[in-house]
């Protein structure tokens, strides 16, 4: 029997906790689930609500030739505009948590200094690939700081296993993994191999998420979580890579598989199903609470990653309504056709067992939702860097 770590929160009614009643013979994890908002718009604990979703749209204003990539001149104009009119957005240049040792340059590395791999997959746990990023500008870090949380990527040439990829889009990713890390220190990166061209991929993948493990000196927590979780539910794969930027070694990053349509096709049998990300936020409200039949309040919480249409939102709203309004004795029969109960229970067990400090059961945020080929919704772990 698994015993709860804390008593039930007063007035707690997180929807996923309701169907945990179905498994009380096996474990009593219900008390650990995150507190549901007392009313739509009011997150747990009196927080101010989730941070704004999405990114500041700037690209179209400066992309004069419409190629989706800003050249050096276009980026310079965009940077000047952003300095003069800084947008309201989440996060700013990383400041860290206090005095830090001034960063020192990493050692120089070339392609001749590292091992190249052949047929091994991108997320093969036995590999430690080296990614060489070459930016046009020497102040690439300052440039990416100024474009953080906008829709502008800084283009780079990337060399992996001796193969060259041009016009790869790069930007800093993350919330606390960005804002809590000072300039000159390792920050998480997002690489888009299809920024300008539709076909280029790195070993079949269009996107790389390189995480700095800013709260984990061992670098092992998210990778171990991923390895364990893959035995029980659909989970992004992870391993390690080394990153060299403009000839300077920036060290090892954990590399996480993108929650993409390719991920959905591989795990759920369709690339056409609806997908959502619930962004991380201390005041997250992504508890699957029923907020009415209008999709507007849901769009302030759940960031849709697939086609934004009424059918997708109706599916999500249907699940939340069943979770919140169905009598316990009828809940399993009503929920099973539209929601994978078994994988959700495993997801919750993993969240608790692995002590995820930034997920559903603590913040009702920082997880994903995907629709399978049968029209059922699944919950999917995300990031896993605070376990």
Label the predicted regions.
Residues 3, 9-23:
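Bacterial N-terminal signal peptides that target proteins for export
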Residues 63-67, 71, 358:
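Acidic carboxylate motifs that coordinate Ca2+ or other divalent cations, activating on Asp/Glu
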């Amino acid at each position: 029997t698994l015993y709860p770590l804390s008593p039930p929160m007063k007035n707690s009614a997180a929807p996923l906790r309701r169907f945990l009643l179905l498994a009380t013979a096996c474990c009593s994890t219900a008390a650990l689930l995150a507190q549901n908002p007392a009313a739509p718009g009011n997150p747990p604990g009196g927080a101010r609500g989730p941070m704004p979703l999405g990114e500041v749209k700037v690209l179209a204003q400066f992309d004069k030739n419409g190629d989706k990539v800003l050249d050096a001149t276009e980026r310079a104009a965009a940077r000047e505009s952003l300095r003069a009119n800084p947008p309201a957005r989440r996060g700013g240049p990383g400041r860290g948590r206090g005095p830090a040792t001034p960063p020192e340059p990493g050692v120089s590395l070339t392609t001749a200094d590292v091992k190249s791999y052949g047929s091994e997959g991108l997320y093969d746990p036995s590999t430690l690939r080296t990614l060489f990023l070459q930016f046009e500008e020497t102040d690439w870090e300052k440039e990416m700081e100024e474009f953080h949380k906008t829709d502008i990527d800084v283009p780079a040439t990337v060399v992996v296993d001796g193969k060259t990829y041009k016009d790869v889009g790069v930007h800093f990713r993350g919330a606390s993994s960005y804002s809590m890390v000072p300039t000159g220190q390792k920050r998480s990166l997002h690489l888009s191999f299809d920024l300008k061209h539709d076909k280029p991929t790195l070993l079949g993948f269009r996107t790389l998420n390189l995480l700095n493990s800013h709260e984990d000196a061992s670098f092992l927590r998210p990778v171990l979580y991923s390895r364990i979780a893959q035995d029980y539910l659909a989970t992004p794969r992870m391993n390690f890579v080394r990153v060299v930027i403009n000839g300077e070694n920036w060290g090892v990053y954990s590399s996480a598989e993108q929650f993409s349509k390719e991920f959905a096709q591989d795990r759920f049998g369709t690339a056409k199903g609806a997908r959502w990300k619930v962004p991380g936020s201390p005041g997250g409200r992504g508890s699957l609470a029923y907020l009415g039949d209008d999709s507007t309040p849901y769009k302030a919480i759940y960031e849709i990653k697939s086609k934004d249409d009424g059918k997708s939102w109706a599916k999500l709203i249907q699940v939340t309504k069943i979770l919140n309004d169905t009598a316990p004795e009828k809940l399993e029969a009503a929920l099973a056709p539209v929601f994978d109960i078994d994988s959700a229970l495993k997801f919750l067990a993993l969240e608790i067992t692995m002590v995820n400090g930034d997920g559903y059961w603590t913040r009702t945020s920082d997880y994903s939702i995907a629709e399978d080929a049968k029209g059922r919704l699944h919950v999917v772990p995300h990031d896993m860097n605070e376990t």
